[in-house]
Amino acid sequence: MSNVTPMMQQYLKIKSEYQDCLLFFRLGDFYEMFYEDAKEASRVLEITLTKRDAKKENPIPMCGVPYHSADSYIDTLVNNGYKVAICEQMEDPKQTKGMVRREVVRIVTPGTVMEQGGVDDKQNNYILSFVMNQPEIALSYCDVSTGELKVTHFNDEATLLNEITTINPNEVVINDNISDHLKRQINMVTETITVRETLSSEIYSVNQTEHKLMFQATQLLLDYIHHTQKRDLSHIEDVVQYAAIDYMKMDFYAKRNLELTESIRLKSKKGTLLWLMDETKTPMGARRLKQWIDRPLISKEQIEARLDIVDEFSAHFIERDTLRTYLNQVYDIERLVGRVSYGNVNARDLIQLKHSISEIPNIKALLNSMNQDTLVQVNQLEPLDDLLDILEQSLVEEPPISVKDGGLFKVGFNMQLDEYLEASKNGKTWLAELQAKERQRTGIKSLKISFNKVFGYFIEITRANLQNFEPSEFGYMRKQTLSNAERFITDELKEKEDIILGAEDKAIELEYQLFVQLREEVKKYTERLQQQAKIISELDCLQSFAEIAQKYNYTRPSFSENKTLELVESRHPVVERVMDYNDYVPNNCRLDNETFIYLITGPNMSGKSTYMRQVAIISIMAQMGAYVPCKEAVLPIFDQIFTRIGAADDLVSGKSTFMVEMLEAQKALTYATEDSLIIFDEIGRGTSTYDGLALAQAMIEYVAETSHAKTLFSTHYHELTTLDQALPSLKNVHVAANEYKGELIFLHKVKDGAVDDSYGIQVAKLADLPEKVISRAQVILSEFEASADKKSSISNLKMVENEPEINQENSNLSVEETTDTLSQKDFEQASFDLFENDQESEIELQIKNLNLSNMTPIEALVKLSELQNQLK
């Protein structure tokens, strides 16, 4: 370190304390980065990487950004998953002898962004923590920008992962005893995981819970927030305890497959349920809407209360339209309050706050004109006239962004400020008069009096006017020479400059002091403002429900006591919106305690998946308290929705399409109850025909015999359609299609009974496969159909590439019964050598004796390899 400058020694010492951050090190008007930080930042920010001490043997990599525009650079880094430590100069270099003292004043992390441009107005920016003491788990999360703070607890990792998926945090804080396996699963939701080894001894306000583990989770979270922000955050609310079981459960797969808040293909909001339902007018309302979509209610009383309000708004179009106008004038009160508390609020923010609270009396008067019994839940608004008066009397209507350059306060707000401003104003009037007088005295009409921060006030004369001009004759003293002009000062101008600039400096300094006082005064209203923001956000959501109900002809759902689901002329709300409303084909659905499984057949592209999804989405909308796209809708209240839709490998976890399919199915079969909804689309297509058919039938039987969950099960295994003979709870339906002159016409209508044709080749023709392929497929299909024995297995058919499907007449038989219908030769071909006799083979015994519960995946793979080698 002997050859390192004192400044770099200071840098290295501070950097050693923040090794997981990029250090923004303040040097004058720049934030500089060095060494690996500089290399990383220059790459991400696409700025020039240079060198410090370039002529030395080991120059230091360096890059920098201007401090006045640093926010955009910080946002870019944070959005790419980095943490940024802001190191400021704590002393004025002009007044300090030796090294300027520097400190990290804040760490910006993905979960603690407070700047207005750094967070999406319509998205919460959550940071989450959890602690485990098996089998108990406690989870706490916070949006630092709004102050929201919640905590819960449960007893299984499945609920933990569901909650993390629902909350969708940008950062997760954990202690150091969390397994690597669980970390990898969390990484699928968020890339930023912070490990905190110890907890602070400081006790934060978690007075609403006595649960020790929940206290620890909340303390871990708040400890980290205060460690990174390094200041008082009075806007963070008292922690609210909630229970995950109070809401409908949907795991990551269900939310993805149903495209509730993000589309699968484009990874965007457009084309999702959130996109459809968002007729909100405020950022707070938009965030609340997403929360409601993520957490549908299971309390009938709470659902009906929301629906009653939607009823009221639906019945009063003029009042609703007026309310939307008022809400459109309301800014993001939650985040404005957050910035007040944090200390980075500016005068324009406070003007936005003023305009927002000025609408509260209008909204309250409007609600008072409607049904008070219905609106009691949302008519708790409290006009903040005292705060409104403070803001109205203090700030000018259009203040500058900076709070340190003056121009913030109205004349008359502060007597001392008025005196300074008057002195400055009079001085500028005097300057204008002096300029006119000097022009007349010198005869130079282009003479002007100007100002800059380096030289102060000066008289400027262009070089063309200096040829016959003698400055000393007029008392001018040369101040600065330019290429095309000379600048002068006079004793009189210098004397007046001291008065003017003294007044301006004092005015600016006083204005900043007054603004800080105003900010602290506004901070006293934090709790009241947050309560108003919560009510306004709920109002905004409910008027949005009424707006889409009227716009798209939705109806109020009702809820059955006997767990019946009956949808009359139901539609998929998103698909309907993106296509012509009049072209959409509505469909019915009825599931009850006797018939709770629909087995759905029909050709590809006919609308099977859309039909199943719309039942799930309608159920979610109903339990949010919204109207639904149906002519009539009677629903049970579902506790959970499970889906198995589409085909996608999980490359991150190394899982194949079929493994993902089985994992999704496993969750449904394990956790579904009679109050659940299951959507299974084409189960078994990721494996061979026999395996897929066997698994599909076994799953249907399991649901029928065990959970009795309402189930929509689409399939191309036509052999399954005979299951209705053995399972009274199963009903066959199909999505109709007609073939006309060799062309396939999709009717998109769900009808009773099974379909008798998959129309696979016709669909391939629609996809414009080469004609040669289509023709060859038709020939092969004809050969299959001609050689198929109606009373035996299709294993006698000549197969091309893939195995054909089992004949429909044998589809109601078990795998064992099916093999009985084969010839001996066919049976030998279809059977495994392991099971050719009744004696247990050595390999079977080895498999039977494996202790799977104590084997790691790697050990299991090694053992499987050994068994495979024995068979070779």
From Swiss-Prot:
Cited InterPro entries = DNA_mismatch_repair_MutS (IPR005748), DNA_mismatch_repair_MutS-lik_N (IPR007695), DNA_mismatch_repair_MutS/MSH (IPR017261), DNA_mismatch_repair_MutS_C (IPR000432), DNA_mismatch_repair_MutS_clamp (IPR007861), DNA_mismatch_repair_MutS_core (IPR007696), DNA_mismatch_repair_MutS_N (IPR016151), DNA_mismatch_repair_MutS_sf (IPR036187)
Output one GO BP term.
mismatch repair
Q: A single Pfam family, by name? A: MutS_I
Task: Report one GO cellular component.
Answer: cytosol
| An annotated Gene Ontology molecular function | damaged DNA binding
Superkingdom assignment? Bacteria
SMART domains per the UniProt record, alphabetical? MUTSac (SM00534), MUTSd (SM00533)
Q: Where does ATP bind?
A: 602-609
Record's PROSITE patterns? DNA_MISMATCH_REPAIR_2
Gene3D superfamilies from the entry? 1.10.1420.10, DNA repair protein MutS, domain I (3.40.1170.10), MutS, connector domain (3.30.420.110), P-loop containing nucleotide triphosphate hydrolases (3.40.50.300)
Q: Which CDD domains match?
A: ABC_MutS1 (cd03284)
Q: Does the keyword Nucleotide-binding apply?
A: yes
Please give the SUPFAM superfamilies that the UniProt record associates with this protein: DNA repair protein MutS, domain I, DNA repair protein MutS, domain II, DNA repair protein MutS, domain III, P-loop containing nucleoside triphosphate hydrolases
> What UniProt keywords apply to this chain's record, in alphabetical order?
ATP-binding, DNA damage, DNA repair, DNA-binding, Nucleotide-binding
- Role of this protein: This protein is involved in the repair of mismatches in DNA. It is possible that it carries out the mismatch recognition step. This protein has a weak ATPase activity.
What family is reported? Belongs to the DNA mismatch repair MutS family.
Q: What is this protein called?
A: DNA mismatch repair protein MutS
The species this protein was found in: Staphylococcus aureus (strain bovine RF122 / ET3-1)
